[in-house]
A protein has these predicted regions:
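Anionic-ligand binding region
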Residues: 97, 109-113, 117-121, 125-126
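Residue-level signal for inorganic ion chemistry
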Residues: 17, 53, 73, 92, ...
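Active-site-adjacent loop/tail segments of enzyme domains
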Residues: 74-104, 130
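Mobile beta-alpha loop/short-helix "lid" or hinge segments that flank ligand
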Residues: 22-34, 109-117, 151-163
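Short beta-strand-to-turn element immediately C-terminal to the catalytic PLP-Schiff-base lysine
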Residues: 77, 111-114, 131, 168
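Active-site oxyanion/phosphate-handling segment shared across diverse enzymes
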Residues: 121-195
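N-terminal polybasic phosphate/anion-binding patch
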Residues: 1-68, 81, 136, 143, ...
Length: 196
């Protein structure tokens, strides 16, 4: 088994790590994210992303105590509110209309844990400015986006068709897609997972 375990089933996180040449195994956590969010509703969305990442990493690291485990999570904040992934595609229209012409935050949290204890943590926030898109574009997007509508909290995949929603962004590409890669690679070098 690889020295690193990814405690996530996220396809974009798996692809990003693999493309960067990092060897890892995937063991998604079974953490109840909704229960944690409800219990910690007083925390801001950035702190919730880190808390969820820590819970995932620590939970999986108890099962695989000899391995370094990476937990990751991302939250979205619009108008000061924490938003969740949509449970069904037909809710995407209203979500995207609520985002039209506005800025929102994506907060990414990463935690490396071993033996049930967090050893390293990172929080990064990005600002994304949704353009004032037309209803015609919205119809096209909803018809074309497919699983993007429910796979991510914003009803978009920034690395795919969702990029057309934005005027500009302030933040690192990898942070926007949910895995701030460069600081993570520095930490993995420090822990001896990849070559320094």
């Amino acid at each position: 088994m690889s020295a690193l375990i990814l405690a996530s089933g996220s396809q974009i996180r798996k692809t990003t790590l693999a493309s960067a040449g990092v060897e890892f195994e995937v063991r998604p956590s079974r953490v109840d994210e909704d229960a944690i969010k409800q219990a910690q509703g007083h925390l801001d969305p950035a702190d919730i992303a880190c808390l969820l990442a820590a819970e995932k990493a620590c939970e999986v690291s108890k099962t695989f105590p000899d391995h370094l485990v990476l937990g990751a999570d991302q939250t979205m904040e619009l108008d000061g509110q924490l938003l969740d992934k949509l449970p069904q595609r037909d809710l995407a229209r209203q979500r995207l209309i609520s985002m039209r012409g506005k800025m929102h935050y994506l907060h990414s949290g990463l935690v490396l844990a071993k033996n049930g204890k967090p050893l390293w943590e990172l929080a990064e926030s990005s600002k994304l400015y949704v353009r004032d898109f037309s209803d015609e574009f919205l119809d096209y997007y909803l018809e074309s986006a497919g699983d993007e509508l429910t796979a991510s909290v914003g009803a978009y995949a920034y690395e795919a068709l969702g990029a057309q929603l934005f005027d500009r962004v302030e933040g690192d590409f990898y942070s926007i897609t949910g895995l701030p890669l460069l600081p993570l690679m520095a930490a993995l070098r420090d822990f001896g997972v990849i070559r320094s």
